Amino acid sequence: MADAASQPIYWSELGLSPGIDLGFFTLRFYSLAYIVGIVLAYWHLGKMIKAPGAPMAQSHADDLFFYCTLGVIFGGRIGYVLFYRPDLLGTLDMFKVWEGGMSFHGGVIGVVLAILFVSWRGKLNWLRVCDYIAVNVPFGMFLGRMANFVNGELYGRPTDVSWAMIFPTDPDQVARHPSQLYQAGLEGLLMMAVMLLLFWQTRARWRPGVLVGVFTIGIAGARFVNEFFRAPDAHLADVVRDTGLSQGQWLSIPMILVGLAVVVYALTRKTKGTPEKPASA
């Protein structure tokens, strides 16, 4: 009985498919995750700006929807090439987004640049706009990590835990942490709960920077923890061996520090017109 209980779970036996065959083309779940995540974020942002104190109008939300989508795609890809695959620089392969390879940290930079542009053009308080966008990012984070799991990619390090899995794309075919699910839980569900609670049930949105600061600390902290379970990219194994931390962890440390600085600034800065009670949902 003990031997049977310790047998790893075979991903291939879960009946998962990386896409939906529509006949004329296959809709991959990773693409679907991006689409659904963006639509959910857009819908919820529309609900948020109808509540008292919103820093933007619907027209600004429409602009953010467009430019942040571009920021995620281009920032994520450029960040991946710069941080993880500099060997692709100067080649056509650096533009092949459909072959996979997106950087979380690059996507964050792309979104921040998009927010700065829209805020500058619309004369908006960019820090408050960041707050509103940050609340909605976990929708996409959760769906994206679940898509990674459905694709059987970005699996974790070898382990003997009872829920360990063997993924078909693993050349070593050893039991590993399903780290995609850990990330979906921490970066997605947990951060979703924290950000929605802070926005709808507290006065955090009336203090510019609190929400985006908490989000930055939480998402980077979750990534830092998850990296202990996630298998490092083969071409970056030397970073882990030489420093004890992965590339993702080194990139997360400055994000945590920036998030802390933003929260401290937001809480110590005097605000005007803060209401007695937060608006209800």
Curated annotation (Swiss-Prot):
UniProt keyword terms in alphabetical order: Cell inner membrane, Cell membrane, Membrane, Transferase, Transmembrane, Transmembrane helix
Record family assignment: Belongs to the Lgt family.
Record InterPro entries: Lgt (IPR001640)
Principal location listed in the UniProt entry: membrane
Disulfide bonds: none
Topology term for the membrane: Multi-pass membrane protein
Membrane-spanning segments: 29-49, 64-84, 100-120, 124-144, 180-200, 209-229, 248-268
Keyword Transferase: yes
Record function comment: Catalyzes the transfer of the diacylglyceryl group from phosphatidylglycerol to the sulfhydryl group of the N-terminal cysteine of a prolipoprotein, the first step in the formation of mature lipoproteins.
GO cellular component: plasma membrane
rRNA-binding as UniProt keyword: no
Domain of life, source organism: Bacteria
Pathway membership, UniProt: Protein modification; lipoprotein biosynthesis (diacylglyceryl transfer)
Subcellular location: Cell inner membrane
Name of the molecule in the record: Phosphatidylglycerol--prolipoprotein diacylglyceryl transferase
GO molecular function, one term: phosphatidylglycerol-prolipoprotein diacylglyceryl transferase activity
Ligand binding (a 1,2-diacyl-sn-glycero-3-phospho-(1'-sn-glycerol)): R145
GO terms, biological process: lipoprotein biosynthetic process
This enzyme's EC code(s): 2.5.1.145
